[in-house]
């Protein structure tokens, strides 16, 4: 989920580390936790009534009678096992088998790439950094990453096709994530244990980021000529894996997708200082032939990658992918979303009409609220989403009604921030690729890497 500049579009940092820290392990054990709506989009609010057998041993000689008894026992056992569900050994279609069932001994490790820390680090700092990643923390990230891989594989094969509605694609992705996490998010607080890291972004053509189907909007149908960005996050215990890809059915856009994918991979190889990132140079070496014209691919300059904190998709660091004077550096113990965006347009994004989603501003208390509907809505937000970004679909899934006036009041008071879709000029096409990387004592781990991208 991209962070727009200069506004930032990010939550306040609120990181928390495990109280008992251990050195990073390459293969840790798995964690045990596994019409009014449209008006609100436009900022208009109307009237709202808010107020193996048991005895079987190697080397034991048995008589024929004993063998017969054992056969009878095993037959009973087999009969009993037929009546129950057989243990799953592979994922279903659609994905519904919890990941903890498929990976009882540990989750896959991401791609490990060389990490050259050229900064001076004292022995004390090195010892502290090596303890930042405990086994449960790494397990949470790796579980979330594998869920992302399995769900997006299903989405690419079964959901994302010409003629499909974006609503059905979003719901298919989100249903898969919740099933594999083992948390449906319907009970109070359940969505904070595991589930969606933020609403599924499904952005067509000149819409580069921050669009999702919402109640009150028209049902958008995916066409063969469209370029679709798919951006979704998975979290386990607040540890968010953020990854995105682009789909185009027309080979006309192959160079656009290749340019952005290569730029993202270039960004992943950056070692420490964020001003070293030169993904834009890679991206802008490509051209796209559109309607008989050769159009250079432009790097979108006012949207960036970002660090990720616990329960906060946007931390305090931005990761621009154009040449810059950013003094920030990547440090061991941090998590980053490395993403790049390319366009056949002007390469600058503006806010569009509508609202993608909302994020709680943890720095602003709600104690001064007077509107009853705003107080009630804030209580629901804090109990179910905390500082995770959410959308109206998620509120209505919980059964929340008549929330429009209360939401406007929360936004007006700075307690909740709204996110608008980000667009380039009409008629242009945009693409995005993104991965989450972890910097730990074992190196740089591209946690969301898969065979697809």
From Swiss-Prot:
Gene3D superfamilies recorded for this chain? Creatinase/methionine aminopeptidase superfamily, Winged helix-like DNA-binding domain superfamily/Winged helix DNA-binding domain
Highest taxon in the source lineage: Eukaryota
Query: Residue spans with biased composition (Basic residues)?
Result: 67-82
Q: Where is the composition biased (Basic and acidic residues)?
A: 1-12
Reaction equation(s) it catalyzes: Release of N-terminal amino acids, preferentially methionine, from peptides and arylamides
EC numbers, comma separated: 3.4.11.18
Pfam families named among the record's database cross-references = Peptidase_M24
User: Which residues does a divalent metal cation 2 bind?
Assistant: 242, 306, 339, 434
Q: Which GO terms describe its biological process?
A: proteolysis
SUPFAM superfamilies in UniProt: Creatinase/aminopeptidase, Winged helix' DNA-binding domain
Cellular location(s): Cytoplasm
Q: According to its record, what are the GO cellular component terms?
A: cytoplasm
* Annotated stretches, region: Disordered: 1-101
Ordered alphabetically, the record's keywords are: Aminopeptidase, Cytoplasm, Hydrolase, Metal-binding, Protease
Q: Which family does it belong to?
A: Belongs to the peptidase M24A family. Methionine aminopeptidase eukaryotic type 2 subfamily.
Entry protein name: Methionine aminopeptidase 2-1
């Amino acid at each position: 989920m991209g962070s727009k500049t200069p506004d930032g579009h990010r939550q306040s940092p609120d990181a928390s580390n495990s109280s008992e820290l251990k050195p990073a392990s390459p293969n840790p054990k798995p964690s045990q936790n596994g019409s009014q709506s449209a008006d609100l989009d436009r900022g208009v609010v109307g009237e709202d009534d808010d107020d193996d057998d048991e005895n079987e041993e190697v080397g034991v000689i048995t008589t024929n009678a004993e063998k017969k008894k054992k056969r009878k026992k095993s037959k009973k056992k087999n009969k009993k096992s037929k009546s129950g569900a057989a243990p799953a050994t592979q994922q279903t279609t659609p994905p519904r088998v919890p990941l903890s069932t498929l990976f009882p001994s540990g989750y896959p490790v991401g791609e490990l790439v060389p990490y050259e820390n050229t900064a001076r680090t004292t022995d004390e700092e090195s010892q502290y950094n090596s303890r930042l990643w405990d086994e449960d923390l790494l397990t949470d990230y790796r579980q979330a990453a594998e869920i992302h891989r399995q769900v997006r594989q299903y989405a690419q094969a079964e959901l994302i096709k010409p003629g499909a509605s974006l609503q059905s694609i979003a719901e298919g992705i989100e249903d898969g994530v919740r099933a594999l996490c083992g948390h449906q998010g319907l009970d109070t607080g359940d969505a904070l244990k595991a589930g969606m890291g933020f609403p599924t972004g499904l952005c067509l053509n000149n819409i580069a980021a921050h669009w999702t189907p919402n109640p009150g909007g028209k049902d958008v149908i995916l066409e063969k000529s469209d370029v679709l960005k798919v951006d979704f996050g998975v979290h386990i215990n607040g540890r968010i894996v953020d990854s995105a890809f682009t789909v185009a059915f027309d080979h006309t856009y192959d160079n656009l997708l290749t340019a952005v994918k290569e730029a993202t991979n270039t960004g992943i190889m950056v070692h420490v200082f964020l001003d070293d990132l030169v993904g834009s140079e890679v991206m802008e070496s490509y051209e796209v032939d559109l309607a008989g014209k050769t159009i250079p691919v432009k790097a979108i300059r006012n949207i960036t990658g970002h660090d990720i904190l616990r329960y906060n998709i946007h931390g305090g660091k931005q990761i621009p992918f154009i040449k810059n004077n950013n003094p920030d550096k990547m440090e061991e113990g941090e998590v980053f979303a490395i993403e790049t965006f390319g366009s056949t347009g002007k390469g600058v994004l503006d806010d569009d009409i509508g609202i993608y989603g909302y994020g709680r501003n943890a720095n602003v208390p709600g104690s001064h609220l007077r509107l009853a509907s705003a107080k009630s809505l804030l209580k629901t937000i804090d109990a179910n989403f905390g500082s995770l970004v959410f959308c109206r679909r998620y509120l209505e899934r919980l059964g929340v009604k008549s929330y429009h006036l209360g939401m406007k009041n929360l936004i007006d008071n700075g307690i909740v921030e709204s996110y608008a879709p980000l667009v380039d000029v009409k008629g242009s096409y945009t693409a995005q690729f993104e991965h989450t990387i972890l910097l730990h004592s074992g190196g740089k781990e591209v946690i969301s890497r898969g065979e697809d991208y």
